[in-house]
């Protein structure tokens, strides 16, 4: 937030910390983890949207959601979940960001590790096919982070491409 280190001589002051915490409090709503069913999470997100005018709902991580239904296969559950999130986004005029971690990526014969995409999450191509946009944050071996947009359904959302950012462990920021 301030670009200052978390420790050492030039860390933020107590007054700056309080300003930062006030900013977080006024710009974010955190839901408790008492009920992690998708219905409960979306019901509470809808209330937050109505109360605060929020335009972004972020669910992190995906595998924390409980969606189990008797007699419904895993891939069908994933499809139903993603379609439900998309419908919620349209009904409430907000962006829904679902943070999902891919399966382990194995090295290619040339020694490189491919960057994951929506096809590499939870054994379902639905993460690629249903999403309007898809991003991967991939830590490279040189300590840099590669941000790849592997899908952008609409041109006003953005375009497919990538950039490399350097992480600053002192401030927790990227440049």
Where are these regions (language model features)?
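P-loop/Walker A phosphate-binding loop and immediately adjacent motor/lid segment at beta-alpha junctions
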Residues: 142-175
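Core recognition of P-loop NTPase motor domains used across DNA-transaction enzymes
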Residues: 20-25, 88-91, 157-159
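P-loop NTPase motor core
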Residues: 33-148, 152-155
């Amino acid at each position: 937030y301030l670009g200052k280190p978390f420790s050492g001589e030039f860390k933020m002051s107590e007054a700056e910390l309080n300003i930062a915490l006030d900013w977080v409090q006024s710009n974010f709503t955190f839901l408790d983890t008492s009920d992690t069913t998708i219905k409960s999470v979306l019901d509470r997100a809808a209330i937050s949207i109505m109360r605060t005018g929020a335009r972004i709902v972020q669910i992190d991580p995906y595998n924390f959601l409980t969606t189990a239904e008797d007699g419904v296969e895993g891939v069908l559950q994933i499809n139903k979940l993603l379609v439900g999130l998309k419908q919620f986004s349209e009904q409430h005029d907000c962006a829904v960001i679902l943070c999902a971690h891919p399966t382990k990526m194995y090295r290619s014969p040339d020694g490189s590790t491919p960057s994951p995409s929506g096809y590499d999450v939870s054994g379902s191509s639905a993460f690629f096919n249903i999403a309007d946009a898809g991003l991967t944050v991939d830590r490279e071996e040189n300590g840099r982070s590669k941000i790849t947009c592997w899908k952008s359904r609409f041109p006003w959302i953005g375009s497919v491409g990538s950039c490399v950012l350097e992480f600053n462990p002192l401030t927790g920021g990227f440049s």
